[in-house]
């Protein structure tokens, strides 16, 4: 609801909050349905039934996600990889496994085309922006000592951040 309240107004866009599996939309009323970085949180079989109901014939369904952050200087990239794949492992919820499988283990309703491997989100981030992104990870939100862990991560990151650099280039490879 807070994100919807902050969304920019547009005369041709109607914002609403509803369960993805029970949208309340009319039958065959949508040309496209896009799920961005969220399909792993949904009850996919129920969502697929809802999409089949609300999507017009020939409509487009797209599941888009992203692989772990890439493109950092080598020492920082190693730190990011270890943080994501090892240090936070005990706090990742079970649904995150779908992301690691690149959604290939979820039933897509109909024919599918993979997202081209060269598509990615390009980022130019400060240390604070990187930490802000990391703090949104579900594992960090579930960690027993998240505030202390974030303080420790900041200290580690300060030691790894290249001297004299304000912002660094990263990218998130798209998948789906």
Task: Identify the function of each model-found stretch.
Residues 1-26, 46:
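Class I SAM-dependent methyltransferase SAM/SAH-binding core
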Residues 41-54:
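A short, conserved alpha-helix within the catalytic core of class I
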Residues 101-176:
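Conserved Class I S-adenosyl-L-methionine
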Residues 52, 56-123:
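Conserved catalytic/acceptor-binding region of the Class I
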Residues 33-34:
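Hydrophobic beta-strand segment of the Class I
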Residues 6, 23, 41-42, 65, ...:
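Tryptophan-centric aromatic hotspots in well-structured domains and transmembrane helices
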């Amino acid at each position: 609801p807070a994100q919807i309240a902050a969304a920019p107004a547009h005369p041709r866009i109607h914002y609403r909050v509803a369960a993805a599996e029970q949208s309340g939309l009319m039958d065959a009323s949508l040309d496209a349905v896009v799920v961005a970085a969220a399909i792993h949180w949904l009850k996919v079989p129920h969502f697929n039934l809802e999409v089949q109901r609300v999507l017009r014939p020939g409509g487009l369904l797209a599941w888009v996600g992203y692989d772990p952050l890439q493109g950092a200087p080598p020492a920082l990239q190693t730190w990011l990889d270890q943080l994501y794949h090892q240090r936070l492992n005990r706090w990742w919820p079970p649904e995150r496994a779908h992301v690691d499988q690149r959604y290939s283990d979820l039933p897509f309703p109909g024919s599918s085309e993979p997202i081209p491997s060269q598509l990615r989100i390009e980022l130019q981030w400060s240390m604070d922006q990187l930490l802000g992104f990391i703090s949104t990870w579900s594992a960090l939100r579930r960690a027993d000592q998240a505030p202390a862990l974030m303080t420790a991560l900041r200290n580690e990151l300060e030691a790894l951040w290249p001297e004299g650099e304000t912002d660094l280039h990263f990218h998130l490879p798209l998948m789906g």
